[in-house]
């Protein structure tokens, strides 16, 4: 693979010289600023060999570098080895930003040109790059080229998978109602139209689903909401007859995907809300300047607050998912002891058990099965090249989830397969303590995730441990497993936590080359009480699956923490046992015994 990457970079540099570029920047995104993208837009992976979901690759005529976050440090070091790309660790002291690195690398040039594809870089990203490099005097930015159009000769086509209806029994609100709410919010912020580019927002507001992006039930399209009209820009071959009839009944006009630029140029309204931080440069530039109203799409916040139907759907999906997970856990240890199991075989077994459940549509992300040292790679994915046998000792970390018609799941369990070291047991218990502290907390309405993040970290901080990823993210309703705008993380995120939002609780500790521990449940934010000091919120734990008690150092848990775990396990048993029989039911009984 390293030979292939070096050959590709060599061809890119030849192309750059021929077309007047000194450097080119490759983000992870697509024209819709998606976190996970269709294969057609995996340009950064193609040029660098780095397969993680987040990262930016930069190639100059002499050097190459790749920026990514802590979830991928270990994986990136392995994948970039021998490629000539230098790993730049984001949010680590001493790591330059992309623009700082470019300014240094290009300082000896009398005139340098940095390329960014305007179709996959946001308007805000391009503007920031231009501003940061403008002070150097010798560097300009161009957005009018995509080298992949010439170099990536076997590039996958833009997907044309069929779109399907997402019925009211699962969505809980009609498209017309959602559009009315959107239009009201637009009036409140002084705009009369909205350009929607995020694929999950389009799917949500139209009550449609697709399969254009692996594990994400979305479809490639744009949506333009004006005072009188709604226009969906999409390849017409993706629409079966029932979807066409539905769109017609909702008075939604359908135009070709490629015609969106022309539609924006001819926009007849007075002002169009455009999110410059997520809308690609080419699209944002097509809107007449005098009609641009810069702001954030209201759909993300609307989608994040689940209605009653969606909340009940999550509960039902978590119940079925819990049954599948328990069947897997009941099988796991004896299967490992019998021999022949690997990380990939565990992944396949868990997916097969989920597929037996009603309303299963697929996995919600590529399953992480990390045995021992692989568990320390936060977003590890076993491949035939990295797959290892799973032995009856140590820890295995399994982070997995599924897409069901009525909800999306995300769960992590770290399982003791046999004898553990004292360090493994203490680390496991610290992670569990943090998980429990966050789950038990109550907080005032209006609080943001960063204001409660420390609860999950405090137990491990006291013993000198930490983790560099976020503690929690929103989860879509048969949509993307990662959604915002809210998060629970150390860095400030201004989106308040609201009743009806889903969010994960997933603290962890990772010791490179040794092992990793993460415990994750998906939670629903619900009202707690109202006092003289205002309204307070709390969490309802949606995920139903035992937390392994074998690694716990019991004396490290407080009375309240033991009580929480026992109560949770009682609820897990009462909820899941009616759907289990024989050995699996008996295994669950033992796994949920009080400690």
Model-derived features: positions:
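Active-site neighborhoods and metal-handling regions in enzymes and metal-associated proteins
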Residues: 1-595
């Amino acid at each position: 693979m390293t030979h292939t990457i070096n050959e590709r970079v060599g061809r890119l540099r030849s192309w750059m010289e021929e077309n007047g570029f000194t450097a080119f920047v490759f983000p992870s995104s697509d024209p819709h600023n998606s976190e996970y993208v269709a294969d057609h837009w995996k340009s950064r992976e193609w040029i660098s060999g780095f397969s993680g979901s987040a990262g930016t690759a930069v190639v100059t005529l002499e050097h190459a570098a790749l920026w990514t976050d802590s979830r991928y440090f270990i994986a990136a070091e392995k994948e970039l080895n021998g490629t000539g790309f230098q790993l730049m660790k984001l949010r680590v002291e001493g790591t330059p930003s992309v623009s700082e690195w470019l300014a240094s690398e290009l300082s000896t040039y009398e005139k340098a040109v940095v390329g960014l594809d305007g179709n996959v870089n946001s308007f805000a990203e391009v503007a920031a790059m231009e501003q940061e490099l403008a002070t150097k005097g010798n560097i300009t930015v161009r957005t009018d080229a995509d080298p992949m159009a010439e170099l990536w000769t076997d590039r996958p086509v833009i997907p044309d998978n069929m779109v399907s209806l997402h019925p009211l029994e699962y969505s809980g609100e009609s498209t017309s109602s959602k559009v009315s709410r959107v239009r009201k919010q637009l009036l409140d912020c002084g705009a009369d139209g909205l350009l929607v580019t995020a694929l999950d927002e389009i799917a949500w507001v139209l009550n449609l689903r697709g399969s254009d992006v692996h594990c994400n039930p979305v479809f490639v399209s744009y949506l333009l909401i004006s005072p009188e009209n709604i226009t969906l820009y999409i390849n017409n071959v993706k629409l079966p007859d029932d979807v066409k009839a539905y769109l017609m009944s909702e008075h939604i006009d359908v135009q070709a995907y490629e015609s969106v630029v022309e539609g924006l140029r001819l926009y007849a309204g007075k002002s169009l809300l455009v999110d410059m931080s997520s809308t690609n440069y080419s699209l944002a530039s097509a809107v007449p300047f005098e009609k641009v109203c810069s702001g954030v799409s209201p759909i993300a916040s609307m989608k994040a607050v689940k209605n009653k139907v969606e909340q009940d759907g999550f509960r039902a999906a978590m119940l079925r998912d819990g049954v599948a997970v328990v069947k897997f856990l009941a099988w796991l240890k004896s299967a490992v002891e019998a021999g022949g199991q690997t990380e990939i075989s565990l992944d396949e077994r868990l997916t097969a058990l989920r597929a037996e459940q009603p309303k299963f549509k697929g996995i919600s992300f590529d399953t992480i099965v990390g045995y021992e040292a692989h568990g320390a790679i936060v977003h590890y994915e076993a491949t035939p090249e990295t797959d290892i046998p799973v032995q009856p000792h140590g820890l295995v970390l399994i982070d997995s989830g599924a897409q069901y018609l009525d909800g999306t799941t995300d769960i992590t369990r770290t399982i003791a397969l046999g004898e553990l070291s004292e360090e493994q047991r203490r680390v496991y218990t610290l992670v569990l303590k943090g998980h429990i502290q966050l789950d038990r907390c109550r907080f005032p309405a209006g609080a943001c995730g960063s204001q409660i993040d420390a609860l999950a970290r405090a137990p491990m901080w006291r013993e000198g441990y930490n983790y560099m990823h976020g503690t929690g993210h929103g989860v879509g309703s048969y949509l993307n497993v990662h959604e915002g705008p809210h998060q629970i993380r150390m860095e400030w995120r201004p989106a308040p936590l609201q009743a009806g939002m889903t969010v994960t609780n997933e603290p962890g500790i990772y010791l490179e080359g040794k092992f990793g521990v993460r415990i994750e449940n998906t939670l629903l934010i619900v009202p707690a009480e109202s006092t003289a000091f205002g309204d307070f919120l709390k969490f309802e734990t949606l995920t139903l699956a035992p937390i392994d008690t074998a690694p716990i150092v019991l004396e490290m848990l407080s009375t309240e923490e033991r009580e929480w775990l026992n109560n949770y396990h009682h609820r897990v048993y009462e909820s899941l046992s009616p759907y289990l029989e024989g050995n699996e039911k008996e295994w669950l009984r033992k796994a949920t015994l009080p400690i």
